[in-house]
Swiss-Prot record:
Coiled coil: none annotated. Residues 33-162, 210-335 form the EamA domain. InterPro entries: EamA_dom, WAT1-related. It is found in: Membrane. GO terms for cellular component: membrane. Keywords: Membrane, Repeat, Transmembrane, Transmembrane helix. This is WAT1-related protein At5g40230. The chain crosses the membrane at residues 19-39, 51-71, 83-103, 112-132, 143-163, 195-215, 227-247, 260-280, 292-311, 315-337. Belongs to the drug/metabolite transporter (DMT) superfamily. Plant drug/metabolite exporter (P-DME) (TC 2.A.7.4) family.
Amino acid sequence: MTRGAGGETVAWSYFCRDVVPFTAMVAVECVTVGSNTLFKAATLRGLSFYVFVFYTYVVATLVLLPLSLIFGRSKRLPSAKTPVFFNIFLLALVGFMSLIVGCKGIEYSSPTLASAISNLTPAFTFTLAVIFRMEQIVLRSSATQAKIIGTIVSISGALVVILYKGPKVLTDASLTPPSPTISLYQHLTSFDSSWIIGGLLLATQYLLVSVWYILQTRVMELYPEEITVVFLYNLCATLISAPVCLFAEKDLNSFILKPGVSLASVMYSGGLVSSFGSVIHTWGLHLKGPVYISLFKPLSIVIAVAMGVMFLGDALYLGSVIGSLILSLGFYTVIWGKAREDSIKTVAGTEQSPLLPSHTIEEEASLSCD
């Protein structure tokens, strides 16, 4: 009986520690790409990205308010004069800027490009961690060499995706086929300025996302309450976005949303991505760390391609395929370097985590199943 109970305990611990986080992160990637696709469809019908950003934070705040009151733990809310509140406000400012830049980038390009560029996140995070002395560089270490090489390869892949669009390799059957008079040479030598601008904006977004990860880690160390932190984050982002978006959007009538794809995109983004998606990301960051979360980024490319072709009639371009392959190679090189570094530290008996403290198996199971 004891043995059976022990086996059940181990199985339950594995389920809470590995299966639940994995399923949650896959679901978040699907929801995020779905939000990008829906937003792109809404912008094609005239939705202003300022309106989208403002209402996204408003909806997320309203959704999380009752949840923070119901599921909030006994820890008191941080005072406005404490470092916790200042860090949450700074987190909201960075998150607001990243969402504004990202929405504009998708307007210029596509959700598929956004998913491809998102693979820069680990490289950016590593670079920022080095700059802020949160990561140690030992040039003779294979782990450090892998992270440096992976960062360079990732940036190279992003440049390919941004600067080289190339011919179509996959398109919706309902789209008009390209003219046979357009030569491959014209595809190779042509530059789409909108595509390049969109790519640069999206690269800026994921640089800000990397900054957001580091700040979020600091907040969770000071105040480890996921739902409350995300609620305060969205509340501060709402207060920041209100004057900016109302000033930037000259047509106030655009803030009146009628039933349709525009209203659906706002409700979807605020009700799922900025609220529950942010809570799951924060929980996963606290439980597994930022490297684990970033492992799921390449999955978003496949999801974005499928959704873009099916719902937007987007085409898949050769440059995106080649660049995404290079990006993924660099991405997994950085991840291998990080995993190698962690294994060396484990063997050496050191317990050092640059972004978040590690958890024991029992603590992880408790965190994941709370």
